[in-house]
Amino acid sequence: MASLFFCSFFACAADSSPAQATPKSVAEILLPARNAIKAGNYEKAIDLLTEADQKKSADWHNLMGYSLRKKAVPNLIEAEKYYITALNLDTTHRGALEYYGELLLLKNDLVAAEKMLARLDKACMFGCEELQDLKKSIQQYKAKPR
């Protein structure tokens, strides 16, 4: 009976230790930056992403590239580096494929944008929003007089 008491006591003592904080997922860490992007506050998103420092995440690189491309004075050179890194980390990252394709159109590189579209088509076997968006951007680009 005494051994049962001691086992119960130690089991309770083990349970009473302070709970360790569960580490946040990358998605949770990036959520404030995503919210800033949705609000159109790209400078704030860049600051939040810099603070989050998730350089092993394709999503982080994609969001940084997007924010740099969409801010008031776009930085296409840096944005392109982030998209390329995102795609090196995840070759089928749909967001990076779409946004990099759009950046390539800004650089008047239709051939490269269409290559991103082809890669996106493979990544979205049954279609996806990113594929439709990049197709639309390419169609609009082609419709503009040059």
Sequence positions of predicted segments:
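Structural signature of tandem alpha-helical TPR/SEL1-like repeats
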Residues: 39-44, 72-85, 107-116
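Residue-level recognition of tetratricopeptide repeat
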Residues: 34, 66-68, 102
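Structural marker of alpha-solenoid helical repeat scaffolds
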Residues: 55, 89, 122-126
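Canonical tetratricopeptide repeat
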Residues: 63-64, 99, 133-137
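Register position in tetratricopeptide repeats
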Residues: 38-39, 70-72, 106, 123, ...
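Terminal, low-structured helical/coil segments at or just beyond the last alpha-helical repeat
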Residues: 16-26, 114-146
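TPR alpha-solenoid repeat register
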Residues: 60-62, 96, 130
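Alpha-helical segment of the N-proximal tetratricopeptide repeat
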Residues: 24-52
